[in-house]
């Protein structure tokens, strides 16, 4: 049959980060949000069995030659920007690719959403009763010099009208959880669909590795996931990442 996945972890000095997103999505879909929060802050050790199980779930296909294009050895060496190209080869090298909403920027020129490709919500477990968790990043605004005008501007940014101005800009990528927005204002069906996923979320959590200290979230977690897909066991990798946590406490 067809190979299910195209996966690439390569990203120059940041190689490994795409696998951290996989881990975060899996943790949100297998455990309650409080457990995710404990994992991110290391209140729950990185080598807790629940984290190891999540890593091995990722490995059940990422380390299986039958489930990933190019075989498991290609996962760590394929650049994440190149990995979706297998979707569009003839015949296709894979049927699915998991990545954030920006990934179409790296698709071959001329391919069209809804015609050459489409997307779906990363499924939640029907047996876990954890609702519809969504993982994401975003922009946060903060006041550095307080004034009435500044506060009025921030209030306006929370108003549907300001949101819809951004939504209407072609290719802006602007997604918003504001339930008062008019989805028809989006520049495309793709962004309407992506925004609907966000509106349907019962839980939202910020990217876990981005919340972790840099030595872990942009260090040992990245390299650990490369080590894991290259052959090390989940326990070995989790123990090493936990050691890096311990080293900064």
Where are these regions (language model features)?
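Extracytoplasmic/periplasmic solute-binding protein
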Residues: 1-44
């Amino acid at each position: 049959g067809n190979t299910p996945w195209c996966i690439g972890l390569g990203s120059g000095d940041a190689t490994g980060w795409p696998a951290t997103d996989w881990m975060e999505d899996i943790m949100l879909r297998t455990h309650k949000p409080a457990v995710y929060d404990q994992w991110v802050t290391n209140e729950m050790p990185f080598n807790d069995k629940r984290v190891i199980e999540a890593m091995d779930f990722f490995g059940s296909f990422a380390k299986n030659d039958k489930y990933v294009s190019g075989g498991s050895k290609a996962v760590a060496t394929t650049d994440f920007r190149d990995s979706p190209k297998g979707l569009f080869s003839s015949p296709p090298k894979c049927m699915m690719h998991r990545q954030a909403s920006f990934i179409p920027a790296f698709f071959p020129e001329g391919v069209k959403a809804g015609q050459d490709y489409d997307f779906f919500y990363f499924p939640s477990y029907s047996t876990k009763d954890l609702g519809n968790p969504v993982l994401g990043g975003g922009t946060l605004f903060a006041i550095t010099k307080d004034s009435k005008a500044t506060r009025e501007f921030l209030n306006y940014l929370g108003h549907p009208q300001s949101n819809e101005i951004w939504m209407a800009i072609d290719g802006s990528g602007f997604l918003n959880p504001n339930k008062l927005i008019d989805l028809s204002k989006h520049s495309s069906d793709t962004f309407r669909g992506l925004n609907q996923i966000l509106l349907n979320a019962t839980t939202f959590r910020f990217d876990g590795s981005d919340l972790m200290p840099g030595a872990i979230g942009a260090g040992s977690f990245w390299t650990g996931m490369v080590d894991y897909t290259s052959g090390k066991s989940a326990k070995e990798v989790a123990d090493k990442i936990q050691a890096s946590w311990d080293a900064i406490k």
